[in-house]
């Protein structure tokens, strides 16, 4: 048994919404308590997708419960440099649009580093920012996120514990992650003005928030690792009142979640037993059926062994459970109605191309529902290529040239004067949408589906022309609910790949969940696929679908049909490999692990998690 390796208090909630409500309520209580004492409240604020839920809850508390911001003073962590306050990418604009203009805060009480000052004045501006914080009495409550490099604010690897507000160079990984917001890494500023680690550490209370599987590894390093200049978030271990707030996905790599049996007695479940035995198999390099009593004892699993007659009996139970997960085509459903929800027009083939084809081969009524257009992920040069095709063919076949010519000219002129990161015109967005649609239709035909088996939902929340989307609204839910009522599916497949850097997967998941809550029909089984950003662990997966070499090649061929995404996707995240390369490696790796555990050897595998059906809506 080992001691809990967590070096900072951690609170884990199952969902991001629960985290946002908890932190917002803590801030509201602080504002009210200090107001009653005749004091102002000084908040340190962050930007990005992580704190938006907090800001929405604070706005709700202001509107519905009268939370008063007139005595609140705010200091933001950072701002890109150079950056005009009016820019779509400005943190000034972000804060006003997402919080300040919705509450009764005094404009003079808002402080955000300026990205528009002359370079020669930056040092003076940084000193003024530090003085303003001190004159306000210091920060009472600081909100932080954590970057892929472990940065807090823009304190990149190597930042000193005593650093103050200053101009910094942005890490390559940080700029890559931000590429989605700027429509390409080349458009991301190379510098930023940020509060220093020392400035942050002087806050009286700190809340660091992290959500999603993609943050799990860096969260583990920040929470369980030694204090390290290479991971600025580890400095928070020295703060007396810092707390890390995580959703279940971001907490996945913490010892308490990943290997809880190492920390002491636990309530064993069949799933935990499988996880422990798979972990032991990998730790020892032995297949499941070859594990012996000494392996269990030497790796802290004596309590698990004591629950069974022998190591052989336990090994057999786990081996049989793992074997039951493997389901080739003959063991997959037949004659069912199936909806495959695909957040973007390529997620279906990327993450579930193999199972999609097998379900279709099994005489199921399969429909692929593309939830968003994916149009912001199309490069401008792709549009120019299609425009050239239209122009040439209109001359060849003499169709609609008089009506087509003005449109072509309008689009070409717009693209010629378009600034980096500028929102596309309606015409350009429409063309990019159609490009993604024809690619999606071409891709599913490679998997033997017909074009009429596709439905393009074009959910409204996505239609901003920007990476930052609107919240899921009633119309989004109605569209999905209407589809459920029309098809009345037995099974739905949903993206469980919630680490999508720009959040669309998570929002599409929320839209389906809300629709299921209102759906009055027989609840469908919900299958969750992954693949674009990570794969399900073997122990967590409920279905493992074997793919032959030919089937994997066909799946990759389907991915190739998404030509606008193939060579270099506009928003690849930190992983710069093409999607087909990620998928090939992940699907092969899953099969290889199954082989190492002692199960039959397969060329590749897709993994699916099955959740219980949602409870049907109550009838009036």
Model-derived regions, located:
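N-terminal glycine-/serine-/threonine-rich phosphate-binding loop
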Residues: 1-42, 60, 332
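Conserved phosphate- and dinucleotide-binding cores of soluble alpha/beta proteins
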Residues: 6-7, 11-14, 18-19, 81-89, ...
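Structural motif
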Residues: 42, 73, 140-141, 205, ...
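Short Gly/Thr/Asp-enriched flexible loops that form oxyanion-binding sites at enzyme active sites
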Residues: 54-60, 152-165, 500-516
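A short, structured active-site edge motif that brings together acidic residues
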Residues: 71-81, 111-116, 455-457
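Short internal beta-strands
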Residues: 72-78, 210, 243-248, 367-371
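Active-site beta-strand->loop->alpha-helix modules in alpha/beta enzyme cores, enriched
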Residues: 119, 275-345, 349-528, 557-561, ...
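A conserved mid-domain beta-alpha-beta active-site/ligand-binding segment of alpha/beta enzyme cores
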Residues: 536-592
């Amino acid at each position: 048994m080992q001691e809990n390796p967590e070096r900072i208090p951690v609170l884990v909630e199952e969902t991001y919404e629960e985290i946002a409500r908890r932190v917002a309520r803590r801030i509201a209580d602080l504002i009210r308590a200090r107001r009653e004492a005749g004091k102002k409240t000084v908040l340190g604020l962050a930007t990005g997708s992580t704190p938006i839920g907090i800001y929405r809850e604070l706005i709700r508390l202001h509107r519905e419960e009268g939370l008063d911001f007139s005595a609140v003073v705010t200091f933001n962590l950072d701002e890109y440099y150079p950056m005009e306050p009016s820019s779509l990418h400005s943190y000034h604009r972000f804060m006003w649009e997402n919080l300040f203009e919705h509450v009764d805060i005094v404009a003079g009480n808002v402080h955000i580093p300026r990205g528009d000052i002359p370079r020669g004045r930056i040092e003076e501006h940084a000193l003024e920012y530090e003085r303003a914080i001190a004159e306000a009495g210091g920060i009472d409550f600081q909100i932080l996120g954590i970057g892929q490099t472990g940065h807090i604010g823009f304190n990149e690897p190597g930042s000193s514990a005593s650093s103050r507000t200053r101009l910094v160079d942005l890490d390559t990984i940080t700029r890559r992650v931000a590429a989605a917001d700027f429509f390409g890494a080349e458009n991301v500023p190379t510098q930023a003005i940020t509060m220093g680690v020392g400035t942050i550490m002087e806050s009286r209370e700190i809340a660091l928030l992290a959500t999603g599987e993609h943050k799990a590894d860096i969260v583990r390093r920040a929470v369980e690792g030694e204090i390290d200049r290479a991971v600025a978030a580890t400095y928070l271990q020295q703060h007396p009142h810092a707390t890390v707030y995580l959703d279940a996905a971001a907490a996945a790599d913490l010892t308490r979640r990943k290997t809880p049996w190492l920390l002491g007695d636990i309530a064993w479940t069949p799933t935990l037993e499988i996880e422990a035995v798979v972990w032991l198999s990998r730790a020892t390099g032995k297949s499941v059926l070859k594990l012996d009593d000494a392996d269990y004892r030497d790796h802290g699993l004596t309590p698990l062994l004591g629950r069974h007659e022998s190591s052989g009996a336990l090994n057999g139970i786990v081996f049989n459970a793992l074997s039951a997960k493997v389901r080739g085509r003959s063991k997959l459903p037949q004659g069912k109605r199936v909806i495959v929800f695909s957040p973007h027009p390529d997620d279906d083939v990327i993450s579930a191309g193999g199972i999609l084809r097998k379900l279709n081969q099994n005489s199921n009524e399969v429909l692929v529902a593309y939830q968003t257009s994916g149009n912001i992920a199309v490069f401008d040069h792709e549009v120019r290529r299609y425009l050239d095709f239209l122009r040439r063919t209109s001359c060849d076949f003499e169709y609609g040239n008089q009506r087509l010519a003005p449109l072509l000219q309008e689009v070409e002129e717009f693209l010629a004067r378009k600034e980096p990161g500028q929102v596309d015109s309606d015409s350009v967005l429409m063309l990019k949408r159609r490009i993604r649609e024809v690619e999606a239709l071409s891709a599913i035909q490679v998997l033997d589906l017909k074009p009429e088996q596709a439905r393009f939902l074009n959910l409204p929340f996505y239609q901003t022309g920007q990476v930052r989307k609107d919240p899921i609204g009633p119309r989004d839910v109605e569209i999905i609910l209407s589809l459920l009522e029309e098809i009345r599916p037995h099974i739905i497949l949903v993206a469980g790949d919630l680490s999508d850097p720009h959040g669309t997967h998570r929002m599409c998941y929320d839209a389906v969940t809300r629709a299921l809550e209102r759906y009055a029909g027989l609840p469908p089984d919900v299958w969750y696929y992954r693949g674009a950003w990570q794969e399900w662990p073997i122990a967590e997966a409920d279905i493992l679908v074997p793919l032959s070499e030919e089937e994997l090649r066909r799946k990759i061929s389907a991915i190739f049909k998404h030509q606008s995404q193939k060579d270099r996707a506009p928003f690849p995240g930190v992983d710069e490999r093409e999607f087909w390369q990620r998928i090939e490696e992940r699907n092969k790796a899953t099969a290889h692990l199954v082989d190492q555990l002692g199960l039959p050897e397969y060329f590749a595998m897709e993994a699916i998690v099955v959740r219980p059906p949602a409870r049907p809506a109550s009838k009036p």
